[in-house]
Amino acid sequence: MFSPEELKRILQESDVIKNVSIIKEAKLFENVYQTVLQGELVINERESFVVYIAVPEKWYRDLVDIYVADYNELVYMPHIDNKGKLCLFETEGILIDQNLPGIMMQSLLRAQTILKQGFSGENKNDFINEFELYWAQLKDCRIAHLAVETDRKNRIVKGGIKKSSKRKKEKQIEYIKRCKKAPIYIGENVESLKRWNLEKTPVMNIAYFVIYSEKYIFPPDIRKKLSIDYLNALLHFVPDGELASIMPRSRQDRIIVFEIHQPSGQTHFVGMYIKGGMLKETSLEKVEELQPLLMERADKKFLMKRVTEQDSENYKKRILIIGCGSIGGHVICELAKAGYEDLTIVDYEKLTEENIFRHVLGMEYVNRYKCEALNTYIQKNIPEVKITTLAERIEDAITEEDINFEDYNLIISAAGNHNLNRWINSWIQNNKIKVPVVYLWNEVYGIGNHAAYIKYGTSYCMRGQIITESAGGCGKTYVPYGNLVSLKTMLLCLKMVKNIFEENLDDNLLISLKGDSDYLEKHNLETSGRYLRQQEQIKILTGKQFVNINCGVCNDCNGK
């Protein structure tokens, strides 16, 4: 622990800063610090600027803050926020050396570099890399959630504002301030607004303009209010005819969104809430109020960047999932989260209390058909997923032609019922359906997880595979296993689906995970010889490796 006097002495010994003193009140812009020092940061032989070196209590986690004292007197430059604090280092994923004097000196050297480059203009293009970061610091900036198709044309999109009622004892001026901060929701159409539950919110037309500029468009100075000149400079990029047809000329409140394409290929999204104003040619005049909107993108293309690099065309593949139980429920939810947007789910059973602890759904959905409950859950939580539900047996759905296997790019059987899987397999083979099938199942008490990928022309056949089955007694029967077991099987499935659509699988594939047998043995049950013989935790068989040559079905399917 260093005292303020010790820190002052250490800084005074440096040639980076001079005239160091201790600030008695260790508080800057409502932030309380352990120690605040003041000094003149040396930029070159002729110039130095007064800065504050603020040491937080948790400096070992948050590093040191450095503020420029007379920030408003400086030229507008990157890496300084609207309070004059310099953005020094990105701490995400960095292991910080627990050496406070060293951290202070490194921070001062970084601050020196930022100011030098700022005065010379060397780092001006950093504004482009962090455009939205500066836009968010504009005075009275308001959040707007944006879910539209990008890189298209100038057009009208739809939006809504969730307004709340005035609270008891709330002053009118406070209520107005709160309303001005209410989030705005913007979608491609009325249907896309449903993700935010805006059914009772009035829908408004919003002007959406796509701008391509040959020169860089920089963010406005965050120390000043957003100006009408900045707005009109952006409007000048819009062709006259389109501007007049998309944005009304009348004096009324309006919202404008700009999709700005920079010469470097970067794209920025900004918006403005405009009170009053008349459109005259390509400019707005007599605007009463201009409020910047920070666009929080919620379109699928943007959201999926964080989770995958898969070809977006694969998301459009049609997938049929049979069984919405413990395995199927997890598989369906994770397929939706993985970006697949066209799912058909089939299950004739309702969710019961006894399955709550191994199903993705909770008590809220008990006594509802599993497929319909899953659809409700996903539509509430995951955007842009089309789900078709069928609360009936798959055999009936196929024979009555409610669905057709050939309409899908992939079939997943997660029912865990081997007799049903044989029926699916038989129908596929007899009708020469060229759609691949993935079969998923768990073993009793979690001793195993299996995923099998079967291409057209070959067969899934439990008679040809030596796999231990479990049978319950009369009444309510079930195969005992926990939620974690189904999660493991789901992970096998997701990886397999990705490989199928990326055409990484040339042949049939069977993956078996060997689980722990302790729980099974506690119930006085014995493992099979196959379980004992398998030494690997993960066993992978391909092609005809898992075909039993003594099975007529497998031999017939493989031309034996």
Question: Model-flagged regions — what are they?
Answer:
Residues 126, 136-276, 406-410, 414-560:
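Glycine-rich phosphate/adenylate-binding loop
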Residues 348-383:
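Glycine-rich phosphate-binding loop and adjoining beta1-alpha1-beta2 segment
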Residues 375-409, 415-417:
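A structured beta-alpha segment of the ubiquitous adenosine-cofactor-binding alpha/beta core
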Residues 334, 400-401, 422-427:
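A short acidic, amphipathic alpha-helical/loop segment
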Residues 25-91, 101-102:
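Compact alpha/beta protein-protein interaction domains typified by the UBC
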Residues 79-124:
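Structured beta-strand segments within beta-sheet-rich domains
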Residues 309-350:
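Glycine-rich adenosine-cofactor-binding loop
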Residues 266-319:
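N-terminal charged helix/coil linker that caps or initiates catalytic domains
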